[in-house]
Amino acid sequence: MTAMDVEAPILCAQTTVIDARTVGESFIRLVVAGAELARWSAEVVDAGTVRDAYVKLIIPPPGGGGVVPDPAAIRDWLALPESERGWMRTYTVRRADTVVLDGAQVPALTIDMVVHPGDDEGPGSSWARSVAVGDELHIVGPGRGHAPWAAWAPGQAGRIVCAGDETAAPALLAIAEELAAEPSSAREISIVIEVPTEADVRALSDGAPEFVTLVARTAVAGEEVIRRLAGILDVGEESIGSVMGGQRPAADRDREWHPASEVSDGDPYVFLAGESGLIKAMRRLTVDAAGIAKGSVAFMGYWRRGAAES
């Protein structure tokens, strides 16, 4: 790659919604495409798996419109009223493809958006319910020649364990597809995802590799995925009760977010993603109860219950 091929580190691309459909009961799957995506990092937009790469969607205010941000002057954009500029929200890319749009071959990204009910519904969820094919959407992401915004780094780990909630489902399912495609992999792989309903389990299980387990939420959010994770890690029942009753993250920490250190060949690698309170509980289970070294654990707090995120 020459200097001429390297774009700015952060770019804002105009895209068009070319498909929008409901998946299960809790997800809306969007496919967006546009020529400007061709200037993005190859590890985000080139056809194939995308691991846990995430992008920033510019959610327009009610009635449409909004202000397109200049990545070089993002503070100016953030200073505008939300009712004028809209909102910036983070989503993981589920899949990258190419499609024909307006007679030209262009990149396309599939993004699964969780629609939270009631008080947990934010502007992204509300917008997703009303989006239509043909709508425009601006997306911010890394420019070509730059690394994707992602944390997945298992190295040559001999054992991989992943766990998360519905917001982690797109990343974990993309990761599962990448792992399943590895030639003659000798890794021991376990992935468990808690989703809101049985309908979500059925919809997301379709085509998922056999080492992926999807479970429906019980009355207590996070309880089922923690129980399944404890089983995978061979941790006793008393530890489950302990982490479920643990304190929430300290008030001055918006999210739990820590990539793993470099993983040595054959070591275990644990990847935890989802709501920050859940992540803290699963991290305690993994490190304190199961005794896995902190450097082998990546934990990504994608959101925090009751708090806005941009």
What is each stretch, according to the model?
Residues 1-310:
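Extended, composition-driven regions rather than compact fold-specific motifs
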